[in-house]
């Protein structure tokens, strides 16, 4: 009888290790599920998107950072036969406009989030919480358990090995290229 929460993917498996009952609901069904009491909490998107969906009307606690998804990956899926039927110029146009769209989305998204979480707090009574280092460490430990379980799948094991190799290389850059994590906001 744990917390009932909308969560997706492997992050849901992490949450289950903490006794959370997870379910994957499409975005359009989350508000109604919260309103009816079918779920107690949700993970969905960035604060700007969550606010547009009205979540602030029903849930009054936001937790940051999103440990399970530090970035959003955008994609455009095109049928291979359709792609192969395009001219080089059409392919180039699609590549340029999708890259521009992603850059624009990242820039605007980051620019809007701070004001939105402040507005949620001041106008709608939402409390913003910052995960402690201890809690983030617990999530990481549970995540690594999920990884070990998932590595039984050969494809997952291959992807994880590739990711881990990249991560090891990136750790050096991130250790010297960025400021340390700031203190939690007051």
Regions found by a protein language model. Give the residues of each.
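N-terminal secretory/targeting leader peptides
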Residues: 1-186
């Amino acid at each position: 009888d744990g917390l009932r929460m909308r969560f997706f993917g492997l992050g849901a498996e992490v949450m289950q290790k903490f006794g959370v009952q997870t379910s994957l609901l499409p975005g359009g069904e989350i508000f109604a599920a919260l309103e009816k009491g079918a779920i107690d909490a949700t993970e969905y998107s960035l604060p700007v998107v969550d606010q547009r969906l009205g979540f602030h009307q029903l849930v009054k606690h936001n937790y940051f950072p999103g440990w399970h998804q530090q970035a959003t990956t955008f994609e455009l899926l095109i049928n291979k036969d359709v792609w192969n039927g395009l001219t080089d110029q059409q392919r180039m146009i699609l590549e340029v406009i999708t890259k521009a769209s992603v850059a624009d989305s990242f820039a605007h998204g980051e620019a809007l989030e701070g004001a939105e979480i402040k507005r949620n707090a001041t106008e709608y009574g939402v409390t913003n919480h910052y995960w402690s280092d201890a809690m983030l460490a617990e999530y990481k430990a549970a995540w690594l358990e999920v990884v070990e379980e998932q590595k039984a799948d050969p494809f997952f094991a291959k992807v994880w090995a590739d990711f881990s190799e990249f991560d090891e290389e990136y750790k050096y850059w991130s250790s010297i290229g960025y400021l340390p994590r700031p203190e939690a906001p007051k």
